Amino acid sequence: MTESVLIVGAGSGLSASLGRVCASKGMRVVLAARNIEKLQNLKKEIDADTIKCDATNIKSVSSLFKKTDKIIGAPNLVIYNPSKSLGGSIVDLDPKKAYEAINITCYGGFLIAQQAAKRMLKNNAEVFFLPVLPQV
């Protein structure tokens, strides 16, 4: 059986590199992002599927996993990589922008991990959830 990976928050940096590595190892790759148009070149390069998803929206995350179930079943690996860089001193940060960054990084990560765990634990897979706070 072919192993599979779902990469949420896919883009042109780290997640693209991880997608290439996974594809080179023979894994089936699904890329998820708010803007899937930006993923078209990578999609073609690694023969991936793409799904539009806002990781901070419960309905969008639920839809992502229902679509993923149809494409690859329960993924063997889920990578959560969305981020929002804040930059600057904590003294000068706009609290609304900080909230958005934490919402994307932590709450979105929780929503994805929860849906992934519901599927992956049925297959005795390990689930590791490590939210990383935005860089300040």
Residue spans for each PLM region:
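Substrate-binding pocket helix/loop in short-chain dehydrogenase/reductase
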Residues: 89-90, 94-102
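Active-site loop of short-chain dehydrogenase/reductase
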Residues: 3, 74-75, 120-134
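Conserved glycine-rich Rossmann-like NAD(P)H-binding loop of the short-chain dehydrogenase/reductase
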Residues: 27-39
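A short, exposed helix-loop element centered on a Lys and neighboring polar residues
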Residues: 113-114
